[in-house]
UniProtKB/Swiss-Prot annotation:
Signal peptide: 1-23
Name the record gives this protein: Putative lipid-binding protein At4g00165
Disulfide pattern: 34-90, 46-76, 56-75, 92-128
InterPro entries, per database record: Bifun_inhib/LTP/seed_sf (IPR036312), Bifunc_inhib/LTP/seed_store (IPR016140), Hydrophob_seed_dom (IPR027923), Plant_LTP/defense-related (IPR051636)
Compartments where located: Secreted
Length: 128
């Protein structure tokens, strides 16, 4: 019983395809993993509206008169939920644009007072 020419041609073609496929696949080939996404850069912009930080200015005027008086809830609620760095950036921006009416020389002190009074810390190495 003989195999027909068409079937024989089909089998030869199939064998050639299998040979070609396995002949070109290297046994040690590995898939290169995707590189990890870049680390999230610390933003240098305030995620909140800087003009709203004007409510913190009235408290800064009272610091010299009544030491220990906490800033208004409005002021602290603006930085609530922000990381220390983000809160520092927001207050620094507000201080630099004179929204809070602080002399440039007193900006680092005012920034520290506001952040600490609202339960935040000035990040290490942060310069306003």
């Amino acid at each position: 019983m003989g195999i027909s020419k068409a079937l024989r041609s089909l089998l030869i073609l199939l064998l050639l395809n299998i040979t070609f496929f396995f002949g070109h696949v290297t046994p040690g080939a590995t898939v290169k993993p995707c590189p990890p996404p870049p680390a999230k850069q610390a933003t240098t912009k305030c995620p909140r509206d800087t003009l709203k930080f004007g409510v913190c200015g009235s408290w800064l005027g009272l610091v010299s008169e009544v030491i220990g008086t906490p800033p208004s809830q409005e002021c602290c609620s603006l930085i609530k939920g922000l990381a220390d760095f983000e809160a520092a950036v927001c207050l620094c921006t507000a201080l630099k644009t004179s929204i809070l009416g602080v002399a440039p020389v007193k900006i680092p002190v005012a920034l520290t007072l506001l952040l600490n009074s609202c339960g935040k810390n000035v990040p290490q190495g942060f310069v306003c």
